[in-house]
Amino acid sequence: MIPMIVLATTNQNKVKEFQEILKDFAIEIRSLAEFGPIPEAIEDGKDFDENAYKKAIHTAKILGIPAIADDSGLEVHALNGAPGVYSARYSGEGATDASNCDKLLEELAGKEDRSANFTCVISIATPGGPALTYEGRCDGKILTEKRGKSGFGYDPLFYFAEYDKTFAELSMEEKNRVSHRGKALAEIKAEAPQIIKWLEQRLSEEKPAKPDHSEFEGNDWSK
């Protein structure tokens, strides 16, 4: 049995979402904060997939245990997919949730198409390099003003029609059921036995080779 897996993030909001959704997962999920500070991964990937893998493998190699990481963001159609991988730092150096939301509203001023989607890619990596990848997406639109007090990031602006609420107006249970991250984590829960078996096999190898990341797309358990 795999004793633990570390969640490669210092974002406590993400930690809460992961731990809540995966509370019945058969592996102990530990927060990165429990291991003390480590060098930050360089998130210079061209998409969410690359950045999630970079964070997961970076953490797994440093700590010597499996790591799970996500990269997620908002893609606004009228802005050609922006802010995308730059969602957390959209308003520049020292960006905050508030400044990012303000920047988004400025960029969308006068635009009729306010459709958008949240995307989340989760990578589970072993210290030797292999990784499994999961993805979730949620479609909505950007409002002209903030609504709600819960959540984080762009949640106060992201309107989800099915509930007639923004993500910041949803309870944690509601958000976890429909959000991009919730959908990706639901896939992980559904494949928990296979994931545990895969991790055990990889960790039992003395010198696991570091394959190309694309080799593991589609989660082929035979590799």
Swiss-Prot record:
Q: Does the keyword DNA repair apply?
A: no
Q: Which stretches does the entry tag as region Disordered? A: 203-223
Q: How does it assemble?
A: Homodimer.
Q: Which organism is it from?
A: Desulfotalea psychrophila (strain LSv54 / DSM 12343)
- Report the EC number(s), separated by commas if there are several: 3.6.1.66
Query: CDD domains under this entry?
Result: HAM1
Instruction: List the protein's name.
Output: dITP/XTP pyrophosphatase
Q: What does the cofactor section's free text say about binding?
A: Binds 1 Mg(2+) ion per subunit.
Q: Per its UniProt record, what Pfam families does this chain match?
A: Ham1p_like
Cofactor requirement: Mg(2+)
Q: Which UniProt keywords apply?
A: Hydrolase, Magnesium, Metal-binding, Nucleotide metabolism, Nucleotide-binding
PANTHER family assigned to the protein according to its UniProt record, in alphabetical order: INOSINE TRIPHOSPHATE PYROPHOSPHATASE, INOSINE TRIPHOSPHATE PYROPHOSPHATASE/HAM1 PROTEIN
Residues that bind Mg(2+) = 71
Q: List the InterPro entries.
A: dITP/XTP_pyrophosphatase, ITPase-like_fam, RdgB/HAM1
Keyword match Metal-binding: yes
GO CC, alphabetical: cytosol
List the active-site residues. 71 (proton acceptor)
Q: Give the GO molecular function terms.
A: dITP diphosphatase activity; ITP diphosphatase activity; metal ion binding; nucleotide binding; ribonucleoside triphosphate phosphatase activity; XTP diphosphatase activity
